[in-house]
Amino acid sequence: MKFSSIKEYFYKLYNICYLITLFPLGIFIYLYLQMQVGKLNSLVQEAGQILIFQIGLATISLAVLTTVHLVMKRRIKKIRTVPSLGDRLEYYYYYSIQRMMGIAVASSFMALGLWLTNSDLFSILYLVILIWLSLQWPSPKMACKDLALRGDEREMVLYKRDTLG
């Protein structure tokens, strides 16, 4: 995807990341509100089964988050050697979307756990995932850090400038 400016680049990246983030968040909020008003009944009633779902879904989410983090770290290291800033940013764009998709999948497991068990633990775990998401958000500062930008390239991306000077 080609961008006419760095401002447009981050504008489009943010919009896509917001959409990816808001979809599971909307589902989670809907399920949580239904649970609070008593319209959502737990599909799993036995305490032992609830514990199994809590441990299982938390472990799956942690595995997804860890895998996404390690894979993205390796991919981003590879694109640091690409000579053109535009090409690096294009790769970073797609990798950032993939990172957000992975985090959305992990948060969807928390919504699934809430739906199955009505356990408040999944609300806490969802909040932890949202905090992790905020730390992984593809901001200009994060892009500079991930891509190891220095000098003029760093200034252009960090301050969303289209030209030097």
Whereabouts are the PLM-identified features?
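Select subsegments of transmembrane alpha-helices in polytopic membrane proteins
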Residues: 15-23, 94-103
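Alpha-helical transmembrane segments
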Residues: 47-65
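Membrane-interface helix termini and inter-helical loops of multi-pass transporters
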Residues: 35-46
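Alpha-helical transmembrane segments and their immediate juxtamembrane interface regions
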Residues: 126-162
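Alpha-helical transmembrane segments and their membrane-interface junctions
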Residues: 102-123
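Short membrane-interface loop/juxtamembrane segments of multi-pass integral membrane proteins
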Residues: 80-99, 160-163
